[in-house]
Every structure is written in structure tokens, then in C-alpha cells.
Amino acid sequence: MAGRAVVKGVGHYLPERVVPNAAFEKTLDTTDEWIRSRSGIERRHFAAEGETTSDLATRAAEAALADAGISAEQIDAIVLATSTADLTFPSAATMVQARLGMTNGYAFDVQAVCAGFVYALSNANALIVSGQAKRVLVIGAETFSRIMDWTDRSTCVLFGDGAGALVLEYEEGEGTPQDRGILSVDLNSDGRYKDLLYVDGGVSTQTTGHLRMQGNQVFRHAVEKLAQTAETALDKAGLSSADVDWIVPHQANIRIIQGTAKKMGLPMDKVVVTVQDHGNTSAASIPLALSVGKARGQIKTGDLVVTEAIGGGLAWGAVVLRW
């Protein structure tokens, strides 16, 4: 027998404001066709004025709790992945904890940029299998619209705001790859590449700053590293690409998504794709895609799912789980 962290509920929230590609034609030297052809993105959601990352996270958390059929008081811990917390401190996770009316347990943020949700899943899994928590609420939430340079057409058209959440719960499994729950994790980072994707602000500068990215270099690293980490995670679970029902990748760019699937030898009809509707929502993109994939009827109980992501740091990783 082996303890597993099993998905019991999933949910997401998107701000009401939808911004199509055409909206950028008024202020930037760009077109809808240019954005679509290079990224696959057609539209994205932006938070309203005064709407914060913790607001989005709370709405997604409420949806996941409802899907799981449990109350916030039954949660032992909250792990929230974000790079755009409302304040330097306290954590966005503690803000969500308060808004959910959860007075027990503990809550903390994880920051690994676009790889954040994979890192958060790893943390939540460790809490559960080590006996430190029975139920963990795992959230990815971002308001990247707050750190965009609206004069930089190479970045500002790519990102969106949103949140997604999972409820993980301890269950006994047989200790085989047929168990439901998280089967394996692979995490990596290499700080030598920190200048490829970063924000030029923070406490040391006393400014919020804006996102800066060397897109071509990020793309070059992304496909190679994403396929590698996914295959490593599968190998750790005693599985291979042939066993995969769904890849649920970080939704950064359709060309990265396609390139990774091809490198893994998997057809695109085994990939959950939401980038066209949400843009790159950083740490929110994987839980958003998991929630949408379930709602579409793509992801079903018993399916083998691989999530993989790469972000600033560079940081990257993958999680293999049976839904």
C-alpha cells in the first residue's frame, strides 16, 4: 500500500473583461493575424481595476471546493503559486485562507513563475504523503496585466489573468502506476538563465517593474526541457509516453505546445489546449487547463495526465498523475 494525493475537485475563475487581439492594433504595430500565427492566442482576460490576484484565487478555490463537495474548514493547507501576489507580504495564500473563512491549518505561496503550479503540486503532494496534511487546496493565480509594458508588442500581447485550483486528498493506493493520484514529480532550475525572462523591478528597486523576455531564447530552451522533464517524470513512475492519455501543458505558446508533443511522440489530440482563449496565465495556466479539460469532457477519472511547465529562473518541471 502507498499513500497518494488524489484530485477530488477542480475549478477556475476568469475575469469578466475579455480582450481580443484586435484591441492591440489601436496602440501597437501588430495585427490579429500576427499574434495568432506566432502564439496561437486569440483573446485573453484582464482583471478589472481593483480586482487582485487573491480575488481571482478565492473564486477558483470556491469552485474547486464545490466540485469536491467539501468546505474550507475541511482543508488542512493552502499552497498558492503566483508571481503577482497582491502585496510583498503577507502571502496571497493567507488572504485566500481568510476569505474562505478557514481558521485552521496553514497557507503559503510558492513562486516559480510559469512553473509555479508544478512546484505547488509537488509541495502539496509532499505534505500529503508525509502525513502533514490530509487535504490540500492547490491554487495557481496571476494578474500579469499589472506587470506588462504596454509598449512592448513582443510581450504584452501574450499574457492574461486568471486562476485555477485543485483539491488534493490522501488516499491509500496499491503502490502501482494504476493508482489514482500523483505518481511522480520532476523539478529543475538553472539560474544561469535568469536574464532570459524576468521582471525589472522589485524590493531592491522600489518599483513594481515590467516583464522582460528574450522570446527566441526561451523558446529554444522550452521544447527541449519540457519534453525531457515530462519523460523523466514518466520514467520515475515506471511509465512512458505511450501510456499518456492527456498532456496538460503550461499554455504559453501553441508552437511550444506542439513542439513538445512532437518531441514526446504524441499527437495533438492528446493535448489539452486553452492558450487561444486565455493567453499565457503563468502559474494559473495548468490548473485552468485541467478545469477546462474536465468541463469539456476530455479528462476523465482514471486518465493518465502529464502536466509540464517552464518559467523564469529558468525553472521547469513535470507532474504525472492519474485523474
From Swiss-Prot:
Pfam families associated with the record: ACP_syn_III, ACP_syn_III_C
Enzyme class: transferase
Pathway: Lipid metabolism; fatty acid biosynthesis
Location(s) in or outside the cell: Cytoplasm
Residues forming the catalytic site: C114, H250, N280
GO BP: fatty acid biosynthetic process; secondary metabolite biosynthetic process
Catalytic activity as recorded in UniProt: malonyl-[ACP] + acetyl-CoA + H(+) = 3-oxobutanoyl-[ACP] + CO2 + CoA
UniProt keyword annotation of Lipid biosynthesis present: yes
GO MF annotation list: 3-oxoacyl-[acyl-carrier-protein] synthase activity; beta-ketoacyl-acyl-carrier-protein synthase III activity
InterPro entries, sorted: ACP_syn_III_C (IPR013747), ACP_syn_III_N (IPR013751), FabH (IPR004655), Thiolase-like (IPR016039)
UniProt entry keywords in alphabetical sequence: Acyltransferase, Cytoplasm, Fatty acid biosynthesis, Fatty acid metabolism, Lipid biosynthesis, Lipid metabolism, Multifunctional enzyme, Transferase
Functional description taken from the UniProt entry: Catalyzes the condensation reaction of fatty acid synthesis by the addition to an acyl acceptor of two carbons from malonyl-ACP. Catalyzes the first condensation reaction which initiates fatty acid synthesis and may therefore play a role in governing the total rate of fatty acid production. Possesses both acetoacetyl-ACP synthase and acetyl transacylase activities. Its substrate specificity determines the biosynthesis of branched-chain and/or straight-chain of fatty acids.
NCBIfam families: fabH (TIGR00747), PRK09352.1 (NF006829)
UniProt domain comment: The last Arg residue of the ACP-binding site is essential for the weak association between ACP/AcpP and FabH.
Family per similarity comment: Belongs to the thiolase-like superfamily. FabH family.
Protein known as: Beta-ketoacyl-[acyl-carrier-protein] synthase III
